[in-house]
Design a protein with these regions (language model features):
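Short, Lys/Arg-enriched, disordered terminal segments
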Residues: 1-5, 36
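A generic hydrophobic-segment detector
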Residues: 4, 131-132
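Asp-based phosphoryl-transfer active-site loop
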Residues: 4-21, 43
Length: 132
């Protein structure tokens, strides 16, 4: 069965490891085995792709870096082979304000929060208090 596996993408937090924790030894051994069998291994995360994500393999003492990273839930993709990050067109702050103004009744009723990412800066803010 393992011979058929060509690519593996795994979420980081609470999948490969507990938040900010080292990888369990069994996970390290499994990833090394897949890497030795030439399986392309990547990370998938809701976070923006930064140098921290690009060096997770060494941080976790795998002996190799991940082949690719899917960031911002698909909004960014890093290809190690090309050493290039591809990004989707993101909404501008002005476009975001327009959409959120339209949705304000729901936002206020449900007490919705939003995760805004960009330029390697991540802020969690309450839309009704901080953005509009």
């Amino acid at each position: 069965m393992i011979e058929k596996i060509k690519v593996l993408a795994a979420d980081v937090d609470m999948t490969l490891s507990a938040k900010s924790s080292p990888l369990p030894e069994i996970t390290i051994q499994a990833l090394k085995e897949l890497h030795n069998r030439n399986v392309k291994i990547g990370l998938a995360t809701g976070r923006e792709i930064t140098e921290t994500e690009k060096t997770k393999g060494m941080f976790w003492k795998l002996g190799f870096e991940f082949d690719f990273i899917i960031g911002i839930n698909g909004g960014m993709i890093y290809d190690r082979n090309l050493d290039k990050t591809f990004t989707m067109d993101m909404m501008s702050i002005e476009e975001m304000k327009e959409v959120l103004t339209f949705l304000m009744p729901i936002i206020e009723e449900k007490k919705v929060s939003i995760n805004v990412e960009g330029n390697q800066l991540r802020n969690v803010m309450n839309i009704s208090d901080d953005l509009l």
